[in-house]
C-alpha cells in the first residue's frame, strides 16, 4: 500500500529555483505598486531620523561594480536603521557637470566650435539627464530603496542657486580670491585641476644634473650643481634655492669647481664620476644668499636665495627654482619679489617667452633642452628614471604646474576650524580621522575655477579695469535668477539684464567665463537636506576611501566656511573592488565583472550577499569563481527557507502556536540559539559590520538548522498527526526562527526575504520591510544550552561512527542503524536534563539506541533488527498487518 498521500509533506509556492534575473524585477514592481519606500517613512515618521546623505556618482555610462558595491552598502545601513524604527529618508544624487560629459558629447560628433556656449551646454545637459535615467534604472535593479522620483542633480536650477549662495557667502567672508599661482594644469583637458583630481602613476622622465655658472670673485670658475626631472621648466628658472642652515661644500674635481650639499657629496661623487673630488671650503647655505649665476640657456642673471623647502634627501641640495611652475618655488619667490614666469600655454606648448623652444610641446622641448645643455657644456649627467608623477584622473595623462589667473578658496583661513571639526566627527575607522587630518594640514589653497563650459558659472563681474566685483548682493541676485531661469542665462543674457534693478555700481562690466570645480558642485550637496527640511548635519557619509581627498574634503570645507559645522556626524569608508587576483579591473586585462550581468544571470541578492560577505573597509575581491561560491551560500539560504515555509503548511500561529516554555527542551534550545544569534547580528549591524552578520547567520542556517534541527524533525513533521503537540511545538519553533531570519536578512537579501514573507500565510504586514528588526535576547535558560553543548559533542562523535559504518557497508542510511552508547555520568545527566534518554533514536535519526553509563565514551553501530515501517521508514520491533508501526497506525486511524 502507498502511504505517500497520508504524509504531511512540505507545501509552498516559494520555488526552489530562484530565477532571480526574472523574479527580482517583478518584486521591485510590487514594491513600487504598494509605495513601499513611502510606507516605511510614514510608519516611522514620528521616530528619530537617520539621514545618510548620498555622495553623487558621476552621470556617465553604465554603473560599474564599484558603484554597485557602494550603493549596496548604503542600502544595508538604511534598511537596518529603518527596521530598527528610525525615520530614514534617502535622496539619491548625481554629479552631472564636468569634462567627461563634454568629451562624450564631442565624441558623438558635436562640433564645439560651431556652437555658442549656451548651445553646447544644452546638449551636455540632455546627455547628462539621459545618463541619470540609465543609472537610476540600474541602481533600482540592485534593490536600492530611495526617493528615486525626486533625486538631486547638480544641474538642477535650485541646486545651482544654493551652490552659488554658498560661493557668495564665502566671497563675503573673504575666503574667495583671484590670484596668479602655479597650479596643476592638464594640457590634455586644457584646464586647471585641484589636488583631489590628481592621481599618481608611474612615468618615465629625464633626470639631469646641470651646472650653473656662478658670477663674482668669491667662488671663481664655479658651477652650482642642480638636479631636475623637468628640464622643460629650465626656461622659467629665476633662482637657485639653498637651505640657510645646511652645510655646503666648494670642491674641485679635475680642475673644475662646484658647489653642492656636503651631505650629498658622496652620492654625487659616485653618480657624476667625480673620482678626484677635493673639498676646498665648507660653509652654511646662508653664505650664498644674493650671490648671482648665469642661466645656462639664456643671457640672464639670477640670484641664489634661501628656502626652508630644500631637503637633503635627493639631488644636490641646490634647487632649481621656477616660481611659475611650482608651489614651493612660488612661495619662496614671493619672498624675494621674483617674477612669475610660466612660458607654457594651455595646450602644453612653449610660448614666445621660451625663445628657441616656442611652439614645441613641453615634452618635445624637454629633449631639445637636454641636447642644448649637452652641446653648451652645462649638462653633467643624464638618465631616464621611472617615478611617481601626477596625472589627470580623467585622461590619465601627465599634468604640469603652470601659473595662470585662477579663483581660489583660502584653505589657510579655514584650516584651524577644519581640523577642529574633524575631531568632532565619529570615525568608523580611526585611520580615517588621521588621513583626513593629514590631508587638511598639507592642503594648499583650493583652485575652484575651471576653463571649461559645462558646469556652474562663476558669477563674477569685472569693471572696465578688469577688477572683479566681489559683491555678495550681486552674486545672490544672480543666484535668484539661476533658480528661476537656469544658469545658461549667464551666457545668454547681457550684463545689464543680469544686474539688480537697484544696482548703482560701475557700468561697462564684463562676465567671468570660467566655471566652478565640480568638487565645489558636489561639495555643497548637503544643501539638499536643508532645502527638503531634513536634519543637518547628516548622520552619515559613506563613500570610497578616495573621497578623503575628494567629497569628504570639499564638503567639509564649504560647510565649515558657511555653517561653521561639519556636514556629517559620522564617516564610513570602503576600499576598492579588485579582481580575484587583487588586480585593478580593466578591459585590457579582461577581468571586469559587470554588475548588470551578475544581476541578470545570478540575481541582485547574490551580488548583495557578496557585498555582505567581504570586509569592505579594505580593498575587496570579486571574480566569477568567488560569485559561484556566493551563489552556493545563497542556494542554501533559499532551500532552507523553502523547507521551513513548506513544513508550516497548515500552521496557523493564532490557533496552533505553542509558547516557548511548553515546547520541549530541544525546541527551546533552538529558539534560544536564535535569540542569541539575533542579539549578535543586531550588534554587528549597529557597527556596520556586515561581514560579521553573514559569518553569524550562515553557520546557524547550515549547521544548526539544516544539518540538525530541520533534519531530525522531519520524522515528526511528515509522519505525526497534523495536530500532534510535539509537531505543533516544532512548527512554532520553525515559525519563530523563520520570521526572525527573514527579518535579520532583509537588509542584505530584500528580494528573497520579501518573496519568502509573501509565501507565509499568516503575517502582519504587506511586506517584510515593514516588520521590525528582531532584537533577540540573552539565553532564557543557560543550563539548557550548557547541557545541549554536551549532547552536541556526543552527536558529532555518533555522526563520525555512522559515516564509518556507512563506508564499511554495515548500514546504508542512518535509519538502518542501531546504536549501543556508553557515556559518562556528565553526558548521561545532560541527556536526562534535555529529556533525550528515550528520544535519541529520533534526534540522531537512527532506528534504535541502547544507552548505558560508563567511565568513558564508547559507540558501536550495528544494523538495526526489526521491520521497516512502510510509512515512516523507521525500523521497529513490530508492524501491523499493513506494515506500519504503532505511531503510524494511530495517525492513520485519525485520518479515517
Swiss-Prot record:
Keyword line: Aminoacyl-tRNA synthetase, ATP-binding, Cytoplasm, Ligase, Metal-binding, Nucleotide-binding, Protein biosynthesis, Zinc
Binding site for Zn(2+): 869, 872, 885, 888
Motif ('KMSKS' region): 584-588
Record's GO cellular component terms: cytosol
EC numbers: 6.1.1.5
Swiss-Prot/TrEMBL catalytic activity: tRNA(Ile) + L-isoleucine + ATP = L-isoleucyl-tRNA(Ile) + AMP + diphosphate
Chain ranges for the short sequence motif 'HIGH' region as given in the UniProt record: 57-67
Protein name, entry field: Isoleucine--tRNA ligase
Source organism per UniProt: Acholeplasma laidlawii (strain PG-8A)
Amino acid at each position: 500500500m502507498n502511504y505517500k498521500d497520508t504524509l504531511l509533506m512540505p507545501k509552498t509556492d516559494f520555488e526552489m529555483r530562484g530565477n532571480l534575473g526574472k523574479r527580482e524585477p517583478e518584486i521591485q514592481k510590487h514594491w513600487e505598486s504598494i509605495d513601499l519606500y513611502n510606507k516605511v517613512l510614514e510608519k516611522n515618521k514620528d521616530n528619530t531620523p537617520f539621514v545618510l546623505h548620498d555622495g553623487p556618482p558621476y552621470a556617465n555610462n553604465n554603473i560599474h561594480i564599484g558603484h554597485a558595491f557602494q550603493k549596496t552598502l548604503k542600502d544595508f545601513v538604511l534598511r537596518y536603521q529603518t527596521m530598527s524604527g528610525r525615520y530614514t529618508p534617502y535622496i539619491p544624487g548625481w554629479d552631472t557637470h564636468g569634462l567627461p560629459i563634454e568629451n562624450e558629447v564631442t565624441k558623438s560628433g558635436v562640433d564645439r566650435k560651431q556652437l555658442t556656449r549656451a548651445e553646447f551646454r544644452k546638449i551636455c545637459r540632455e546627455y547628462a539627464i539621459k545618463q541619470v535615467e540609465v543609472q537610476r534604472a540600474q541602481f533600482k535593479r540592485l534593490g536600492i530603496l530611495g526617493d528615486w522620483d525626486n533625486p538631486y542633480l547638480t544641474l538642477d536650477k535650485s541646486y545651482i542657486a544654493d551652490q552659488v549662495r554658498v560661493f557668495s557667502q564665502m566671497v563675503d567672508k573673504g575666503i574667495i580670491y583671484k590670484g596668479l599661482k602655479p597650479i596643476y594644469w592638464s594640457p590634455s583637458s586644457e584646464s586647471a585641476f585641484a589636488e583631489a583630481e590628481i592621481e599618481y602613476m608611474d612615468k618615465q622622465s629625464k633626470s639631469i644634473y646641470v651646472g650653473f655658472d656662478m658670477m663674482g670673485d668669491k667662488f671663481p670658475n664655479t658651477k652650482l650643481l642642480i638636479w631636475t626631472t623637468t628640464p622643460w621648466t629650465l626656461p622659467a628658472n629665476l633662482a637657485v634655492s639653498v637651505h640657510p642652515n645646511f652645510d655646503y661644500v666648494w670642491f674641485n674635481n679635475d680642475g673644475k669647481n662646484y658647489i653642492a650639499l656636503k651631505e650629498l657629496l658622496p652620492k654625487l661623487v659616485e653618480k657624476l664620476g667625480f673620482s678626484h673630488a677635493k673639498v676646498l671650503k665648507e660653509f652654511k647655505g646662508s653664505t650664498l644668499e644674493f650671490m648671482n649665476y648665469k642661466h645656462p640657456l639664456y643671457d640672464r642673471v639670477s640670484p641664489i636665495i634661501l628656502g626652508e623647502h630644500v631637503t637633503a634627501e635627493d639631488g644636490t641640495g641646490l634647487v632649481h627654482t621656477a616660481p611659475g611652475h611650482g608651489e614651493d618655488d612660488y612661495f619662496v619667490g614671493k619672498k624675494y619679489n621674483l617674477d612669475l614666469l610660466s612660458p607654457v600655454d594651455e595646450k602644453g606648448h612653449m610660448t614666445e617667452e621660451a625663445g628657441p623652444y616656442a611652439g614645441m610641446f613641453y615634452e618635445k622641448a624637454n629633449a631639445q633642452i637636454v641636447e642644448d645643455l649637452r652641446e653648451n657644456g652645462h649638462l653633467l649627467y643624464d638618465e631616464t628614471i621611472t617615478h611617481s608623477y601626477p596625472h589627470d584622473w580623467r585622461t590619465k595623462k601627465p599634468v604640469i604646474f603652470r601659473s595662470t589667473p585662477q579663483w581660489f578658496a583660502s584653505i589657510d583661513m579655514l584650516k584651524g576650524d577644519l581640523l577642529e571639526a574633524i575631531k568632532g566627527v565619529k570615525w568608523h575607522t580611526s585611520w580615517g580621522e588621521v588621513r583626513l587630518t593629514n590631508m587638511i594640514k598639507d592642503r594648499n589653497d583650493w583652485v575652484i575655477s575651471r576653463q571649461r563650459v559645462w558646469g556652474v558659472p562663476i558669477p563674477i563681474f569685472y569693471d572696465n579695469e578688469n577688477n572683479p566685483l566681489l559683491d555678495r548682493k550681486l552674486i545672490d541676485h544672480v543666484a535668484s535668477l539661476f533658480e528661476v531661469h537656469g544658469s545658461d542665462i549667464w551666457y545668454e543674457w547681457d550684463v545689464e539684464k543680469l544686474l539688480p534693478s537697484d544696482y548703482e555700481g560701475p557700468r561697462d562690466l564684463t562676465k567671468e567665463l570660467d566655471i566652478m570645480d565640480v568638487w565645489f558642485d558636489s561639495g555643497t550637496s548637503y544643501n539638499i537636506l536643508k532645502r527638503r527640511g531634513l536634519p543637518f548635519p547628516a548622520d552619515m557619509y559613506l563613500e570610497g576611501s578616495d573621497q578623503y581627498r575628494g567629497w569628504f574634503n570639499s564638503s567639509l570645507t564649504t560647510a565649515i566656511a558657511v555653517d561653521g559645522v561639519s556636514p556629517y556626524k559620522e564617516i564610513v569608508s570602503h576600499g576598492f573592488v579588485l579582481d580575484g587576483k587583487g588586480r585593478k579591473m580593466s578591459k585590457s586585462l579582461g577581468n571586469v565583472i559587470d554588475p548588470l550581468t551578475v544581476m541578470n544571470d545570478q540575481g541582485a541578492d547574490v551580488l548583495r550577499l557578496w557585498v555582505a560577505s567581504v570586509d569592505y573597509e579594505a580593498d575587496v575581491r570579486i571574480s566569477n569563481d568567488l560569485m559561484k561560491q556566493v551563489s552556493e551560500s545563497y542556494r542554501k539560504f533559499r532551500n532552507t527557507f523553502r523547507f521551513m515555509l513548506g513544513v508550516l503548511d497548515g500552521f496557523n500561529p493564532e490557533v496552533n502556536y505553542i509558547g516557548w516554555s511548553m515546547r520541549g527542551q530541544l525546541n527551546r534550545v533552538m529558539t534560544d540559539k536564535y535569540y542569541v544569534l539575533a542579539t549578535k547580528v543586531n550588534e554587528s549591524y549597529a557597527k556596520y559590520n556586515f561581514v560579521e552578520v553573514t559569518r553569524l547567520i550562515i553557520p546557524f542556517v547550515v549547521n544548526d538548522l539544516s544539518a540538525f534541527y530541520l533534519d531530525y524533525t522531519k520524522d515528526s513533521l511528515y509522519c505525526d498527526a497534523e495536530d500532534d503537540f510535539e509537531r505543533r511545538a516544532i512548527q512554532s519553533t520553525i515559525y519563530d526562527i523563520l520570521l526572525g531570519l527573514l527579518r535579520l536578512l532583509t537588509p542584505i537579501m530584500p528580494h528573497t526575504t520579501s518573496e519568502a514573507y509573501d509565501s507565509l500565510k499568516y503575517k502582519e504586514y504587506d511586506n517584510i520591510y515593514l516588520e521590525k528588526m528582531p532584537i533577540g535576547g540573552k539565553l532564557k535558560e543557560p543550563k539548557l544550552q550548557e547541557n545541549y553543548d554536551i549532547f552536541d559533542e556526543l552527536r558529532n562523535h555518533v555522526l563520525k561512527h555512522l559515516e564509518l559504518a556507512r563506508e564499511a557497508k554495515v548500514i546504508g542510511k542512518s535509519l538502518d542503524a542501531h546504536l549501543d552508547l556508553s557515556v559518562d555520568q556528565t553526558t548521561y545527566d545532560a541527556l536526562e536534563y534535555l529529556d533525550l534518554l528515550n528520544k535519541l533514536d529520533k534526534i540522531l535519526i537512527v532506528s534504535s539506541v541502547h544507552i548505558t553509563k560508563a567511565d568513558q565514551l564508547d559507540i558501536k553501530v550495528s544494523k538495526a533488527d526489526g521491520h521497516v515501517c512502510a510509512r515512516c521508514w523507521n525500523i521497529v520491533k513490530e508492524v501491523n498487518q499493513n506494515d506500519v508501526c504503532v505511531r503510524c497506525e494511530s495517525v492513520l486511524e485519525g485520518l479515517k
